[in-house]
Each structure stands twice: as C-alpha cells, then as structure tokens.
Swiss-Prot record:
GO terms for molecular function: 5S rRNA binding; structural constituent of ribosome. Belongs to the bacterial ribosomal protein bL25 family. This is one of the proteins that binds to the 5S RNA in the ribosome where it forms part of the central protuberance. Pfam families: Ribosomal_L25p. GO terms for cellular component: cytosolic large ribosomal subunit. This is Large ribosomal subunit protein bL25. GO terms for biological process: translation. The keyword Iron does not apply. Part of the 50S ribosomal subunit; part of the 5S rRNA/L5/L18/L25 subcomplex. Contacts the 5S rRNA. Binds to the 5S rRNA independently of L5 and L18. Keywords: Ribonucleoprotein, Ribosomal protein, RNA-binding, rRNA-binding. It comes from the Bacteria. CDD domains: Ribosomal_L25_TL5_CTC. InterPro entries: Rbsml_bL25/Gln-tRNA_synth_N (IPR020056), Ribosomal_bL25/Gln-tRNA_synth (IPR011035), Ribosomal_bL25_short (IPR020055), Ribosomal_L25_dom (IPR029751), Ribosomal_uL5_bac-type (IPR020930).
Amino acid sequence: MITIKAEVRKDQGKGASRRLRSAGKFPAIVYGGSEAPVSIELDHDSVKNQEAKEGFYGTALILSIDGKEVQVKVQAVQRHVYKPKLTHIDFVRV
C-alpha cells in the first residue's frame, strides 16, 4: 500500500498556496467520514513519484498526517495547465 507523508496546513488562502507551490509543496484536503475536513500540504516530488505507480488512483492510500495514519482514496486532482505539476488533490476517507 502506498504511504504519503503530509503536514497540516497552518496558513490558508491564495497567497499561502502560492508560497507552498514555490517551495516545492502543494495544498490538499482530506474530507469524508465522521471527522472534520483537514487542509494538508504535500511534497510535490514525492507525490509525483507515487502518482506514477499503478495503484495510486484505484486503491486506498495511507496518508501520514503529522504522524497519524489515515486511509484515503484520491477523489480529484488538479494540474497546472502546461507544466507537469500537481496543484491540488482532494482525498476522501475510506
């Protein structure tokens, strides 16, 4: 099973997201189930490497959010228009 490390986002908004992306990270969100939605940040290069694996979109993944493991599936992916970059991912809890 694929494991991805994540951190809880401290800042929200367009400016904070742009700073994340320029630092080699990007924003994401985890929602669903009985818990509240959680905004997270992911390392772009590590997620891009995991995305190339066969089971990234079809199977459950494990997100390690500040040490707490959550089982999720990819709900939606947003990409840059012409660069090979991820800009945002929505995860839904399994």
